[in-house]
Amino acid sequence: MLFNKIISLAATLATASALPFAPAPRSISGGVTLINNLSQDLYLWSVSGTASPMVTLPAGQSYQETWQINPTGGGISIKIGCSEDGSDVLQYEYTKVGDLLFWDMSSIDLSSGSPLVAAGFDVSIDDSSCDTVTCAPGDVNCSESYQYPDDHNTRACSSSAAYTLTLGTAN
């Protein structure tokens, strides 16, 4: 009986030590990582034809989403807010078409007094041929984010690249 326990324990330890241990990745290929550098929690919804359940993104933490396809056509919008009611949101919008990702940032539904505007945000991509976005802290009219529905801020890049949206560039 003791022999069986020793063998079982040895097997468990050998298996556990063989498993790779790595910290959570900063960004993922084929998706987007959102990093919350604000001093408050943020609330996220991934919206296609319907909204996903709300996700709380604690201060100092990150959230990852692999590219989704809208089953009813059109794109996906990750809505990012400072309150749980879903109002006053910054949006990371994307549509995956084959190997391309068409994406943009939208501040249309974001008030000028939002902590997200005060903190600033940027999108970086691990493919240097791709356009990125930087909206400086306090820039209420950032030209790199949609302010009006008829703006021209949609970008395209490889869908296999790793995209990182950093919320709170001032910290």
Swiss-Prot record:
GO biological process per UniProt: spore germination
Pfam hit, one: Bys1
Taxonomic classification: Eukaryota, Fungi, Dikarya, Ascomycota, Pezizomycotina
Organism: Emericella nidulans (strain FGSC A4 / ATCC 38163 / CBS 112.46 / NRRL 194 / M139) (Aspergillus nidulans)
Subcellular location, record wording: Secreted; Secreted, Extracellular space, Extracellular matrix; Secreted, Cell wall
Annotated GO CC locations: extracellular region
Entry protein name: Secreted thaumatin-like protein calA
Induction and repression of expression: Expression is inhibited by PKA activity but is not subject to glucose repression. Not expressed in dormant conidia but only during germination.
Signal peptide: 1-18
